[in-house]
Amino acid sequence: MNAPQQVAVSPDTEIKMQDALKAQQASYLQEGYVSAETRIDRINRAIDVLVRHADRISDAIDQDFAGRPHQINLMTDVAASIGSMKHCRKHLKKWMKAEKRPSTFPLGLLGGRSRIHYQPKGVVGIVAPWNFPVAMIFQPLAGAL
């Protein structure tokens, strides 16, 4: 394991982070409802990134951890992340499907119908620990996409 390092942070880092968050929130609001097909495409592109760059990801992890075996990196970070992405892709349409609920009085008598429509909450920040850096980002990202 490497020794801790002090990292200098410029004074305007918080301002830059706030600006980035505001830009992401504005983009989310502008995009509106995202279809299952769009979300599946995003998951597929994330899987593609992991597959295409698996060796580079493993090399970077190896540099950080000073000798973690290549196969372990591929299994714990890359393959585990791809598995989570595939699981979400497989179940996404079912998870997004609206659910019927009984309408309360008097709406039920008047022909009213009640449904729950699942929607994304907005911009999500994922904070990951250092020990499995790729898996701890991409696994929750699968659900966020």
Predicted feature locations:
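N-terminal Rossmann-like NAD(P)+-binding subdomain of aldehyde/semialdehyde dehydrogenases
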Residues: 1-113
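Conserved small-residue-rich beta-alpha loop and adjacent elements
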Residues: 104-145
